[in-house]
């Protein structure tokens, strides 16, 4: 790396920031491997449902972390990263913020049903951090909401495999396996989308929390057999600017999640120790 640019990610050397991870799926393992490289951060602990399943991976790290119950991660870390199913969000985040620690929430859709955790964090000096994830332009939305945002619209197209098992599809008995052309599955608010597609629409909830809220953010979801990537297009009308964003995310090993999600969390964690921070 050119030394002129390395300053942008240089970490302070005073003390390492301890990070714990709840869940070692496709996102959690990538974050764990990156933390094992150091750079002012250390992987201090993990929580997994089946420790034996992940033992080989953990033993292969330079500094294998402790394996702890999820409610004890906050004792061993400064930041707890939630990389588990959204049903586990409260069990992971609540003990951490009660201890005044920071919690990075990947399953941000689950935060809408547990929003009292924000008040709990405030009362105890903790923090809840939502990473940018798959949503480019989140800085622009954060800035625009300081003024007035008139409307936020998002259209998501996903490959068939990335939508299988979504509650909305199951409850409405929609057959997507035989699709030959795009099908609009859903149109409504970000809050409704999060309930119907909890593993697919974290990006919509993050967009809504950065902007006008989950009840004023409009979302369309398409099952599209013609695409191989998760495609998001966002349009924002504000008094400060009118802008649109489009991104095609390469799926990770979990087809419901884009590869960039893990990279976004890694960037966020490194930013906590960076001497020079770029972005809002």
UniProtKB/Swiss-Prot annotation:
Disulfide bonds: none annotated. Pathway: Cofactor biosynthesis; NAD(+) biosynthesis; iminoaspartate from L-aspartate (dehydrogenase route): step 1/1. It comes from the Bacteria. The active site is at residue 232. Keywords: NAD, NADP, Oxidoreductase, Pyridine nucleotide biosynthesis. HAMAP family: NadX. Belongs to the L-aspartate dehydrogenase family. This is L-aspartate dehydrogenase. The lineage of its organism: Bacteria, Pseudomonadati, Pseudomonadota, Alphaproteobacteria, Hyphomicrobiales.
